[in-house]
From Swiss-Prot:
Its EC number is 2.1.1.17. Pathway: Phospholipid metabolism; phosphatidylcholine biosynthesis. It comes from Pyricularia oryzae (strain 70-15 / ATCC MYA-4617 / FGSC 8958). It is a multi-pass membrane protein. This is Phosphatidylethanolamine N-methyltransferase. Keywords: Endoplasmic reticulum, Lipid biosynthesis, Lipid metabolism, Membrane, Methyltransferase, Phospholipid biosynthesis, Phospholipid metabolism, S-adenosyl-L-methionine, Transferase, Transmembrane, Transmembrane helix. It catalyses: a 1,2-diacyl-sn-glycero-3-phosphoethanolamine + S-adenosyl-L-methionine = a 1,2-diacyl-sn-glycero-3-phospho-N-methylethanolamine + S-adenosyl-L-homocysteine + H(+). The lineage of its organism: Eukaryota, Fungi, Dikarya, Ascomycota, Pezizomycotina. Belongs to the class VI-like SAM-binding methyltransferase superfamily. CHO2 family. Residues 1-73, 341-367 are annotated as: Disordered. The chain crosses the membrane at residues 97-117, 121-141, 207-227, 235-255, 285-305, 312-332, 386-406, 414-434, 464-481, 496-516, 570-590. One of its GO terms (cellular component) is endoplasmic reticulum membrane.
Length: 963
C-alpha cells in the first residue's frame, strides 16, 4: 500500500457538486414517493422523510476522486479480492473464472505431481509469482508514478473509447471490458462516464488480483508439500510449534484486515498512483503499531507457516520473499509517497534560511557558513581527520589481535573483560561527561578556559563519542568471534534456526540505528542539545512515531542475536549488562536532560503504547493502571534514594552505528547497432535539418593558439565553434518533410560517442525529446515547444521547436551534437553542428587591484559571477533557483543531491576550488557560497589552480648578475 486514508472523514469535494447530486437524489425520492403514496399522505410523508435521510447518508459516505487534470468524480464502492472471488453473493465475471481456474490448476498440480518434483516445481512457481509481484507490478507502478505511462498507453490504444466515436480500433475489447468492469461495480459506475485514470486503475486491479492470489496460494502449497514432523520431536514441541504458528498466522490475518479497514481498496491497490481521493492522509489502527505494517509485521504469517511446516526450505524462501517485499517498498512505494504526500514546500522569496543548532555549533562567526563534514557513514570516512584515522587503527588492532591469538580460555576471558571495560567506559564515562555537561556545561567550559570556542568543544566531543562507540561495538564483536565455534553438524541443536534468528535480530538493530540516525541527524545522534540551545521543537516522525525510545529494546536486540549465534553464556551476560546499562543511561542521563530542555512538549505515550492500551479489555486496563501506579511510586522512591546518596549513575546507548547509503548502480553504455529500417526508403536526409541556439559563454571562447604550433597553425580559424554556458537550456529547431514519422525524436550526444553518422551506436540515457506530442509518455513531451508547423515557403515541409534543459542536458564540459532519428529507431536523418559546453574561468587578473580596494569588492565580483552559474545548475526553476544572492535555494536542493553536485563541479572549474556537495544546501544561498569561495581562495592561495603571481625565474643579464 502506498498511503492511508481515513474512511470516516467527509471528503473535501466541491460543494456545488455535492449539493447538486444531493438535490437530484432528493428530487428522485420525492417523485417516486409521491407516485406511490396517493391517498396515504401520512405514510407517504413518513416514507419520503426516511428515504431522504437514507439518501443523504449515502451521499455523505461517498468518496470523491480527483485526477491529475483536476477532474472530480464519485468513487464507486468496491470490495476486496477475496470477497469478489469467493463470496457467492458478489457478482462474478469472466476474469473471476480465469483466476479461480488458475488457482484450481495450482491445487491440482500439488496432488498430481510426483513427490520428488513437488518441491522444486512449487518453489519455481512461487518465485515466478513473487517476481511478478515485486518486479512486474513494481515496474508498472514505477513508470506510472514517474510518467503516467499506463494511462498514456490506454489513451494511445483507445481501449476505453466508445466504438461509436470511431477512435477505438478494437470494439470487441471495449465491450468485453465494459461488461467485466460494470459487472463488478453495479452502482455509481459507467465505463464511458468514468475518467480514464479510474478505468485504467480498475483494469490494473484485475491483474493485481491474479498475481496476489496466485502468489499466496502457491506459497501455501509449497509449504504444504514441504511440511513434515521432525524425527524425534517431542509431542509438547509439536503442539507448541503448531500453536505458535497459528497465532502468528492469526495475527497476520488481523493485521491485513485492519489495514484494509483503514486504507480501503484505494490504497490497497495503489490507487494514488492513478488518481487521488479528496481525503486527508492519516494513520490509524495497525498503522500505529509499526512502520509500514503491511510489509513489516504484515509478513509474520510467513514465519508462522514455516514453523508449522517445520521446513528450512519454507523458512528461507519466506525470508527471500519478505526481503523482496521490503525492496519493493523502498524502490517503488516510498519514492511515490514522498512525491505525492510530502512535496517540497514552496520557497519564500527573500527569506533567509535559519541555521539550526548543529549549524550554529560549527559556525565561527555569524556570516560564516556551516561545516558539513559529517562523522558517521562509510562515505564520510576521511583519513585526514583524527577520529577517522584513530578508529581505523583501532579496528585493525582489534582484528589482528582477534585473528592472531588462539581461542584458549585465557584469551577468551581477556576479550570478554576487554569488552566489559569498553562498555563501562562507553556507558559510565560518557554518561558522566554528558551529565555534567547538561548541568554546568563542564565539557564546554574546559575548552573555553584555554581560548577555544564552543564549536571546538562540540567537534572534540563528537570525535570522542565516535571513537568510544566504535571501540565498544568492535570489542563486543571481537569477543563474539573468540567465543564462536562453527557447528560440526548444522542439523543438530537447532543450529540453523539459531543463526537465522540471530542474524535477523542483528539486522533489526542495524535498521533501528539507521532509522534513528536518519531522523535525528548528526546533531541528535551526538547529543547536540547537551551542548547548544536547539531552537527546534520535538517532532515524532519515522521510528519515533511508534516508540519514544526505540533504543530501549530494539537498540539491544542485536546483542542478544549475537548471543544466539555464539550460544555462549558469557556473551549472553555481556549482552544483558549492555542492555541494563542502556536502560540506566536513558533513565538517568537522557530523560532528565530531555525534561529540562523540552518540558511539557515531551510525549507521554508512543503510538504503540496507545494502540496496545486501546486494545485491552476493561479489566486488564484497570489492572494495568494499578500496576503503573505502583511502578511510578517505586520509581519515585528509587530516584529519591539515589539522589540522596548522590551517586552518579550513567549508561550508554547500546546501538550499532552503521550508516547505510543508497546504492547507485552505474550501468556502462551498451553499444547497440541498429539495422537500417525499410521505412527509410524514399526519404531524403537532405530534407531534414537541425539548428540550435542558447546562451553563449562569454569567457569560454578563448584562443587555442599556444605558440607551439607552426606559423600557419597560429592563425585563428574562420569558422567559430558555438560555445554555450554550462547548464543553460538549448533550444533546437528542426525541419522535416510533412509526411515524416510521428515517432521521430532528437537526442543529445557527445561527439566522441558515435563513430557513425548514419546510425547512433549508444543510448541517449534520457537526453532526448520527441518531435510530436502524445506519442511517448507525458514526461518526454515536456521538452516540446511547437510541432509540425507548416513552412510558408515550402508547403511540403514542417518545422518544430524543442528545448533541452534539466536532466536532458550533459552536466559536464565537452563537445556535443544533436541527432534527428527516424521512426523511434536509431537511424540518423540529420546531425547538427558540433558545439561546446564550457565553464569560463573567473577573471582573476583583477584580484590584486580588487583586493587592494577591499575584500568586499572582490566578494561582490564572485557573487555576480556565481549567481547565473547557480541558476543554470538549478534548472532556472523559480521554485528552486534564486533570483538574488540573498534568496535561499529551494528545498529540492536538500532532497536531491544532483543539484549540489552540479554546483560544486561548476565552482571547481570556474574558481579552482573543490567543495563537497553537502556545502551547497548547508550554505543555502549564493552570498554564503561566495563567502566560502573567497575564504577558501585566501587560505589555499599558494596551492590553488589560479595562475601564479609569485616571483618568476630571473632571465638574461639579471640572472647572471645574481651569480
Amino acid at each position: 500500500m502506498s498511503a492511508t486514508t481515513k474512511g470516516g472523514q467527509e471528503p473535501v469535494a466541491p460543494t456545488n457538486i455535492r449539493k447538486r447530486r444531493g438535490v437530484q437524489a432528493e428530487g428522485d425520492t420525492e417523485s417516486s414517493t409521491a407516485q406511490d403514496g396517493i391517498g396515504h399522505a401520512p405514510t407517504a410523508q413518513y416514507e419520503q422523510s426516511e428515504d431522504q435521510e437514507q439518501a443523504k447518508l449515502r451521499q455523505a459516505n461517498k468518496s470523491y476522486g480527483r485526477t491529475p487534470d483536476g477532474t472530480v468524480f464519485t468513487v464507486p464502492t468496491t470490495h476486496d479480492m477475496v470477497s469478489q472471488l469467493l463470496d457467492p453473493r458478489q457478482p462474478k465475471n469472466l476474469s473471476d473464472v480465469i483466476v479461480l481456474a488458475i488457482l484450481g490448476m495450482h491445487i491440482l498440480a500439488a496432488y498430481a505431481l510426483p513427490s520428488h518434483l513437488k518441491r522444486p516445481v512449487f518453489a519455481a512457481i512461487f518465485i515466478f509469482w513473487r517476481a511478478s509481484y515485486n518486479i512486474g507490478i513494481g515496474i508498472l507502478l514505477r513508470v506510472q508514478s514517474q510518467h503516467k505511462l499506463l494511462v498514456v498507453k490506454a489513451k494511445k490504444w483507445g481501449i476505453f473509447e466508445d466504438p461509436a466515436s470511431g477512435k477505438n480500433p478494437r470494439p470487441w475489447l471495449y465491450h468485453l471490458l465494459k461488461r467485466e468492469l460494470e459487472a463488478k461495480i453495479p452502482e455509481d459506475y459507467k465505463l464511458e462516464e468514468a475518467p480514464i485514470e479510474y478505468n485504467t486503475w480498475l483494469l490494473f486491479r484485475r491483474v493485481v488480483d491474479l498475481i496476489l492470489m496466485c502468489d499466496f496460494v502457491s506459497y501455501c502449497l509449497f509449504a504444504a508439500v514441504c511440511g513434515s514432523t521432525p524425527d524425534g520431536e517431542a509431542p509438547w514441541a509439536t503442539v507448541a510449534r503448531w500453536v505458535m504458528g497459528w497465532v502468528l498466522v492469526g495475527l497476520n490475518l488481523w493485521i491485513k484486515l485492519d489495514a484494509h479497514r483503514v486504507v480501503k481498496d484505494f490504497a490497497w491497490y495503489w490507487g494514488d498512483f492513478f488518481y487521488l481521493i479528496d481525503q486527508e492522509l492519516t494513520f490509524d489502527g495497525v498503522f500505529e503499531l509499526a512502520p509500514h505494517p503491511m510489509y513489516s509485521i504484515g509478513y509474520i504469517g510467513y514465519y508462522g507457516i514455516s514453523m508449522m511446516a517445520a521446513s528450512y526450505d519454507v523458512l528461507f524462501i519466506s525470508i527471500i520473499a519478505h526481503l523482496a517485499q521490503l525492496i519493493f517498498l523502498v524502490v517503488v512505494e516510498n519514492p511515490h509517497i514522498e512525491k505525492t504526500y510530502n512535496p517540497p514546500p514552496p520557497r519564500s522569496a527573500g527569506q533567509m534560511q535559519p541555521l539550526d543548532g548543529a549549524k550554529d555549533a560549527d559556525s565561527a562567526t555569524r556570516d560564516s557558513p556551516a561545516t558539513v563534514h559529517n562523522m558517521l557513514g562509510f562515505k564520510n570516512i576521511d583519513l585526514f581527520r583524527v577520529p577517522d584515522y584513530t578508529t581505523i587503527l583501532l579496528c585493525i588492532y582489534l582484528g589482528v589481535l582477534s585473528l592472531a591469538t588462539p581461542k584458549t580460555e585465557f584469551w577468551q576471558a581477556a576479550f570478554i573483560v576487554h569488552a566489559v571495560l569498553c562498555r563501562l567506559w562507553f556507558s559510565l564515562g560518557l554518561g558522566w561527561i554528558l551529565t555534567f555537561q547538561s548541568k554546568e556545561k563542564r565539557f564546554t567550559r574546559h575548552f573555553v578556559k584555554y581560548g577555544e570556542s564552543a564549536g571546538e568543544a562540540w567537534r572534540q566531543w563528537k570525535g570522542l563519542y565516535h571513537v568510544s562507540t566504535v571501540m565498544c561495538h568492535g570489542s563486543f564483536i571481537a569477543a563474539c568471534w573468540k567465543m564462536y565455534t562453527v557447528p560440526a553438524d548444522w542439523t543438530q541443536e537447532w543450529s540453523i534456526l539459531k543463526h537465522v534468528t540471530g542474524t535477523g535480530l542483528v539486522a533489526l538493530q542495524i535498521w533501528t540505528a539507521v532509522s534513528i540516525y536518519d531522523e535525528l541527524g548528526e546533531f541528535g545522534w551526538f547529543f547536540g542539545d547537551f551542548f547548544f540551545n536547539n531552537r527546534t521543537k520535538l517532532t515524532y516522525r519515522s521510528i519515533y512515531r511508534f516508540l519514544n525510545n526505540p533504543e530501549r529494546v530494539m537498540g539491544s536486540l542485536g546483542l542478544y542475536g549475537a548471543a544466539l549465534i555464539t550460544w555462549s553464556r558469557a556473551i549472553f551476560v555481556l549482552a544483558l549488562i549492555s542492555h541494563l546499562l542502556t536502560l540506566a543511561f536513558i533513565s538517568y542521563v537522557e530523560k532528565p536532560h530531555m525534561q529540562k530542555i523540552y518540558g511539557q512538549s515531551i510525549r507521554e505515550e508512543a503510538g504503540l503504547t496507545k494502540f496496545v492500551k486501546r486494545s485491552l479489555p476493561p479489566p486488564v486496563k484497570e489492572w494495568s493502571d494499578s500496576v503503573d501506579k505502583v511502578l511510578d511510586e517505586a520509581k519515585a522512591f528509587v530516584e529519591d534514594f539515589v539522589e540522596s546518596a548522590r551517586p552518579k549513575l550513567a549508561a550508554g546507548v547500546s546501538t550499532i552505528v552503521r550508516d547505510t547509503t543508497a546504492l547507485f548502480n552505474t550501468y556502462p553504455a551498451r553499444l547497440t547497432i541498429s539495422q537500417l529500417n525499410p521505412s527509410l526508403a524514399g526519404l531524403d536526409p537532405k530534407q531534414y535539418s537541425l539548428s540550435l541556439e542558447g546562451t553563449v559563454a562569454q569567457k569560454a571562447a578563448s584562443g587555442r593558439s599556444t605558440g607551439k604550433e607552426s606559423i600557419h597553425g597560429r592563425f585563428p580559424k574562420d569558422v567559430k565553434t558555438l560555445v554555450l554556458e554550462y547548464g543553460a537550456p538549448i533550444r533546437v529547431k528542426w525541419t522535416a518533410p510533412a509526411n515524416h514519422s510521428k515517432n521521430d525524436w532528437v537526442g543529445l550526444y557527445m561527439v566522441i560517442d558515435n563513430r557513425s553518422r548514419e546510425v547512433t551506436e549508444v543510448p541517449s540515457q534520457g537526453r532526448w525529446v520527441p518531435t510530436c506530442p502524445g506519442v511517448y509518455d507525458r514526461a518526454t513531451d515536456g521538452g516540446i515547444i511547437t510541432a509540425d508547423k507548416p513552412l510558408p515557403s515550402q508547403p511540403d515541409m514542417v518545422q518544430g521547436e524543442m528545448v533541452f534543459e534539466g536532466d536532458r542536458l550533459w552536466w559536464t564540459q565537452g563537445t556535443f551534437e544533436l541527432r534527428y532519428h527516424h521512426d523511434g529507431s536509431h537511424n540518423v536523418m540529420s546531425v547538427s553542428e558540433p558545439f561546446e559546453i564550457k565553464i569560463g574561468r573567473f577573471d582573476e587578473d583583477l584580484d590584486e587591484e580588487v583586493l587592494a580596494t577591499g575584500g568586499g569588492v572582490y566578494e561582490r565580483a564572485v557573487e555576480s559571477e556565481l549567481l547565473p552559474l547557480v541558476r543554470n545548475c538549478l534548472d532556472r526553476d523559480p521554485e528552486i533557483a534564486p533570483s538574488t544572492v540573498d534568496e535561499p535555494f529551494g528545498s529540492p536542493v536538500e532532497r536531491d543531491s544532483k543539484y549540489a553536485k552540479r554546483v560544486v563541479y561548476a565552482i571547481h572549474h570556474m574558481f579552482g576550488i573543490e567543495f563537497a556537495p553537502a556545502v551547497v544546501p548547508a550554505d543555502g544561498n549564493v552570498r554564503k557560497l561566495a563567502w566560502r569561495i573567497c575564504n577558501a581562495k585566501q587560505v589555499l592561495a599558494p596551492y590553488s589552480m589560479s595562475k601564479s603571481r609569485g616571483t618568476t625565474t630571473p632571465l638574461g643579464e639579471k640572472f647572471l648578475e645574481t651569480l
